[in-house]
Structures are given as structure tokens and as C-alpha cells.
Amino acid sequence: MTFNVSNATEINTDKSTYLIYAKPGTGKTHTLNFLPGRTLYINVDKSERPLKGNENIDILEFNTHEAWKEWSELMKWLADNKEIINQYDTIAIDNISELFRSMLANLGRNGKNERVPEMSHYQRVDFFTIDSLRFLQSLKKRLVFLAWETNFENYTPAGQQITQAVPDIRKTIRDNVAGLCQVVARLVFNEKSGKRGFILAPSNNVFAKNQLDNREHCLQEDLFKVGDVDDNV
């Protein structure tokens, strides 16, 4: 076995992993129109309409009714078709909240509990989801995972109860998924300006992270324009 060693000056942010989340209909999918280069869009939740007319995005249809088998076959297809995958700069999955639910429903439908998922099904989907995300990162592409938003009740060290906006991912693997990403960004709409933007800095109220630069927020169209800023005002 051999190991590759490289200098930190060679780190390339073009192959980073993003997790963007927001309530349904907020504009998550539209964000993909601002990606540079070519994108392979994995259409899990059938939200492809905001991408209409974009010549740089190819859409891969995904059968959520057979999601458990389909996702496994898709991972094998990606592994076996490097010449196709090498045509793309980005792989986008829209979205992983629905992916988890559809895989769980698929297992429950084929199980022994009258379509209700068994406890073991949750564990299988948890481990399969994380393992497949690791595999996707091995493809050395920019990855963009989209997710819905939910609220999580938490407590500060002082004992104060707070409500935090978080990606709609099972609590058991949420931190693991976020840990595999360089950016976790919450999309919000500003009613006064009429513009959409991303929150990139974590707080008691927002689950977020940004390891690529010093930005704490950005306009929707600037998410993938990585670079430090002098002032975050």
C-alpha cells in the first residue's frame, strides 16, 4: 500500500463539499445555477424546474419509490463510469432529506411490519448514507448536498432553552454529515431587500460552518465564489 503526501499549499477549494439547507420553496435548487463549470444533478425530490434552460447542468433521474436499491446501484454506476463523471466539475444531490425518507419507506414497504420501518432499517440507512457520502468525496469533485430545514430544541451551557435551525437530517448522523462538509449554509430570504443569502457562521439559532474563507454570510449568487473578505458588514 502507498500513501500520497502533498503540501498544504496545494489544497484546492474547488473540490469542497457543501451542505445547503432551507425550508421547501426558499430557493435552494436555484442556487445551483451559480455553480461554475458543468454539474451532474441527481434529481431525488423532483425539484429540477428552477434549473430550466441551464446548459451546464445535466439531470440524472432518481426513482425514489425504489430508493434503497436505486441509491446502491447509483453508487456502483458512479464508480464504474469514471469517464462520464470526469466530464463534470460538480455533483449535486437534491435532496438528502428526501433521500433518507424514501430509502426508509422502501425498506419498510419490503419489510415485515406492514410498511412501517423497523428499528434496524433506521440504522441501515444511517450507515449507508454516511458511507456513500464518503464514497462520493473519493470522486474528487465539488459536492453540493441540499436538505430541508427543521428546528432543533437545544440548551446552552447556562441551561437556557433555545431553538436552532438545522438541516433536516437524522440527529444520529447530522453532526457526522456536517463534519464531512467544508461549508454548511442556511439560505434565508430578506423581505426588505428582496434578496436571498446564506448564513455561514454558527450561532445558538443557526447550524452553520465555513472552513473555506472568513465570510460569515453571502448573497445567494456568491456562495461558490470562495475568498476572504475584509469586512463582513
Regions found by a protein language model. Give the residues of each.
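Conserved P-loop
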Residues: T2-I93, S97-S102
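Generic beta-sheet signal
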Residues: I42-V44, L146, L187
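Single-residue recognition of alpha-helix boundary sites
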Residues: N54, A105-N106, S193
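Structured loop/turn residues at beta-strand edges in well-structured enzyme cores
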Residues: N86, S138-L139, G179
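P-loop NTPase motor core
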Residues: I93-D175
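Conserved GTP-binding G-domain of TRAFAC-class P-loop NTPases and closely related GTPase folds
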Residues: F135, N151-V233
